[in-house]
């Protein structure tokens, strides 16, 4: 009798299980963009103008002083002559960058980080292995570009790569040839999402605001051409320092013309956020740093931005001045982190 009852119970449980709909598996991926402001080692890279970021002991020869004296901007000239970029200062810089990254996702850090102003793969790998070891990031992605100072765009990721990264030069008008040495390419990297599909990402650092607006327009157009070349059924993001100030956007309608027609813009979803960068000279905030999102397939998209997930990651003590603005990394004390705050968003499968 007991065996009969057990058999009936097993049959009923099996039938009940079959009648229940399968439980949906939801995956999420957190993306950060972070301009880490001059993350240099203190070794002179051949072919790059990185003389600012050397120890003071290596800045005493006449050749170095003569090169610095030729710099027209006084603050840049003083930086070239007087910054003492020691091992201890580099260690402090790496430490505070890591703290800013690890404040996200309960100390794990984001799954993907688009980085700007990284000198080379060596300093990126030092950040990853010595200061972000707990985050379990894979070897960094950085391809040396044409910026004469040597600052590059890069990625750190826990997601496996789904192809060979590529660095795309921005196509400028010939009238800007003399300025190309102060520009960075667009780094494309494809990632394998948890459900096995491919996510394409671009890490960008557009021409600085002191360059003509037309150079940033050229950068947006290059990015959008790269977007069109990707499969329509692939989710895509672009993250970085777009260097479009709030004043320029207001005057030239930059985001409405070159971004919103194709992308969802992170700052449109960041409730109550003033910006990621502050310019004290005219007391203005800007979202220089953005994450742009292009889901695939319209309403049938399997990956979407999670509601209310966009945030400014500025919660570490070192990141903020008493007045509530970004605290750039300053010498000689090594206070601050960067003149940019990281922007974070989460995408999830449905």
Set out the residue ranges of the language-model regions.
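N-terminal, active-site-proximal structural segment of metallo-dependent hydrolase catalytic domains
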Residues: 18-130, 141-146, 151, 319-321, ...
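Short, solvent-exposed loop/turn and secondary-structure capping segments
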Residues: 42-47, 125-129, 152, 166-169, ...
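Active-site beta-strand/loop signature of hydrolases that rely on acidic residues for catalysis
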Residues: 31-36, 80-86, 90, 101-124, ...
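Short helix-loop capping/hinge motifs at secondary-structure junctions, enriched
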Residues: 81, 160-165, 297-301
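Metal-dependent phosphoester-hydrolase catalytic domains
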Residues: 19-23, 30, 225-237, 244-350
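Extracytoplasmic, non-cytosolic globular domains
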Residues: 48-50, 113, 131, 140-144, ...
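Bacterial N-terminal signal peptides
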Residues: 7-16
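Structured beta-strand-rich core segments of catalytic domains in phosphoester-bond hydrolases
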Residues: 112-198
């Amino acid at each position: 009798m007991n065996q009969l009852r057990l058999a009936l119970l097993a049959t009923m449980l099996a039938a009940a299980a079959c009648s229940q709909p399968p439980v949906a598996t939801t995956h999420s991926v957190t993306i950060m963009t972070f301009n880490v402001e001059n993350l240099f080692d203190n070794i002179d890279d051949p072919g790059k103008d990185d003389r600012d970021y050397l120890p003071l002991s290596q800045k005493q020869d006449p050749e170095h002083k003569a090169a610095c004296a030729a710099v027209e901007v006084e603050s840049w000239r003083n930086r070239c002559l007087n910054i003492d970029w020691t091992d201890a200062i580099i260690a402090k810089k790496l430490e505070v960058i890591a703290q800013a990254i690890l404040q996200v996702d309960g100390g794990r850090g984001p799954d993907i980080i688009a980085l700007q102003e990284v000198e080379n793969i060596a300093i990126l790998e030092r950040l990853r292995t010595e200061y972000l070891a707990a985050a379990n990031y894979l070897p960094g992605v950085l391809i040396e570009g044409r910026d004469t100072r040597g600052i590059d765009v890069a990625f750190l990721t826990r997601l496996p790569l789904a192809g060979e990264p590529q660095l795309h030069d921005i196509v400028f008008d010939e009238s800007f040839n003399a300025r190309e040495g102060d520009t960075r390419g667009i780094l494309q990297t494809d990632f394998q999402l948890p459900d096995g599909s491919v996510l394409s990402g671009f890490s960008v650092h557009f021409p600085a605001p002191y360059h003509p607006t037309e150079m940033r327009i050229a950068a947006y157009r290059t990015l959008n051409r790269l977007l069109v070349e990707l499969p329509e059924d692939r989710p895509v993001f672009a993250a970085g320092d777009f260097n479009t100030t709030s004043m320029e956007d207001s005057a030239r309608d930059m985001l409405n013309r070159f971004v919103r027609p194709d992308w969802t813009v992170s700052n449109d979803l960041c409730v109550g956020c003033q910006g990621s960068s502050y310019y004290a000279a005219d007391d203005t905030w800007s979202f220089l740093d953005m994450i742009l999102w292009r889901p695939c397939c319209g309403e049938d998209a399997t990956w979407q931005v999670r509601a209310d997930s966009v945030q400014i990651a500025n919660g570490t003590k070192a990141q903020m001045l008493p007045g509530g603005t970004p605290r750039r990394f300053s010498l000689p004390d090594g206070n601050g982190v960067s003149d940019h705050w990281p922007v974070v968003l989460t995408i999830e499968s449905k």
